[in-house]
């Protein structure tokens, strides 16, 4: 299934919405629309610089019953990857520091408390 520029703009707008909701506006996020193998979207990041690239595939072999819904869910998924990227980076660091790990876990918890509270 080929995706159009219209799909890309919808996806990007959804990402921007979720970045704002999740409090990730301090991140510099770039977007790409290109061919991906076996993925609908992909996020790459450099936590130390708070820079990320979210890539949407130009085509995907699997048809979706509701493409707009799938794109919105995928945008949220990619933004959640950015939210959790500090934890991912710490977990992959062989010089793992429990204090830093706990700090990042609680940062995510505070974000979720704001979103889910009340």
Regions found by a protein language model. Give the residues of each.
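N-terminal soluble segments of membrane proteins
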Residues: 1, 9-11, 27-32, 38
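Alpha-helix boundary/N-cap detector
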Residues: 2, 6-10, 74, 100
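Ordered, soluble secondary-structure elements with a strong preference for glycine-centered loop motifs
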Residues: 5, 65-70
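Zn2+-dependent metallopeptidase catalytic core
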Residues: 5-27
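Intrinsically disordered, low-complexity boundary segments flanking structured domains
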Residues: 13-19, 38-43, 71
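Catalytic zinc-binding patch centered on the HExxH motif and its immediate surroundings
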Residues: 31-56, 60, 64
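Post-HEXXH active-site segment of zinc metalloproteases
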Residues: 49-51, 61, 69-70, 82-118
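Short alpha-helical catalytic segment bearing the HExxH-like zincin motif
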Residues: 70-78
């Amino acid at each position: 299934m080929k995706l159009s520029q219209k799909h890309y703009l919808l996806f990007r707008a959804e990402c921007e919405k979720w970045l704002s909701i999740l409090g990730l506006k301090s991140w510099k996020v770039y977007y790409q629309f290109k061919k991906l193998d076996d993925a609908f979207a992909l996020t790459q990041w450099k936590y130390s610089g708070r820079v990320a690239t979210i890539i949407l595939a130009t085509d995907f072999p699997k048809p979706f019953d509701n493409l707009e819904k799938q794109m919105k869910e995928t945008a949220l998924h990619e933004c959640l990857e950015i939210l959790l990227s500090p934890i991912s980076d710490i977990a992959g660091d062989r010089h793992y520091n429990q204090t830093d790990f706990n700090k990042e876990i609680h940062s995510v918890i505070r974000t979720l408390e704001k979103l889910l509270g009340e």
